[in-house]
Amino acid sequence: MMLFGKISQQLCGLKKLPWSRDSRYFWGWLNAVFNKVDHDRIRDVGPDRAASEWLLRCGAMVRYHGQQRWQKDYNHLPTGPLDKYKIQAIDATDSCIMSIGFDHMEGLQYVEKIRLCKCHYIEDGCLERLSQLENLQKSMLEMEIISCGNVTDKGIIALHHFRNLKYLFLSDLPGVKEKEKIVQAFKTSLPSLELKLDLK
């Protein structure tokens, strides 16, 4: 397990180097492997542990309910009773999470905050999938989407399903074209939402 964690961190670090076009296929394949959902694992260890493993494998961080410290090292995931560690916040900055992995989040009941920053594989379908998860519709309070170039108006509008969302920050999203339409949509669907935009 420790070896896998170190190798995955090293491989994720290599993605920042300039590569030929052919290497993109390799990284796409490797990221798909990191994102693959293992339903047996979810059943065996519970949704929070399985989602933690997925997120950290892909370079994200998690914070558990009642803790201040962010968990970012795959090799130091806490052990103990399956129901002890519940994910409260996710910071997916520079991670390789993608839509095929989002089934990991289906059983999460306590996630209040998600930060998606510089996530090259996040697209509208990911946001639509997230917003359809009933547990997240109830628990989500804050969301930040920053520098995710594949996100468009369609994906942002889908977030109105997070009926308890209190804060949404959107920045550097070149695919988002109709700011005023988004503002009006959220004013109608989530009138108490604090919406902050830093879009061109």
Curated annotation (Swiss-Prot):
Q: Which residues form a coiled coil?
A: none
Question: Lineage from the top down?
Answer: Eukaryota, Metazoa, Chordata, Craniata, Vertebrata
Subcellular localization: Mitochondrion; Mitochondrion inner membrane
This protein is called ATP synthase subunit s, mitochondrial
Q: Kindly indicate whether the keyword Repeat belongs to this entry.
A: yes
Name the gene that codes for it: DMAC2L
Specify where it is mainly localized: mitochondrion
Q: Where is this region: N-terminal domain?
A: 1-61
This protein's GO CC annotations: cytoplasm; mitochondrial inner membrane; proton-transporting ATP synthase complex
Q: Which InterPro entries match?
A: LRR_dom_sf
Give the GO molecular function terms. Answer: metal ion binding
Q: Which family does it belong to?
A: Belongs to the ATP synthase subunit s family.
Transit peptide, UniProt annotation: 1-25
List ligand-binding residues for Mg(2+).
59, 93
> What does the protein in this record do?
Involved in regulation of mitochondrial membrane ATP synthase. Necessary for H(+) conduction of ATP synthase. Facilitates energy-driven catalysis of ATP synthesis by blocking a proton leak through an alternative proton exit pathway.
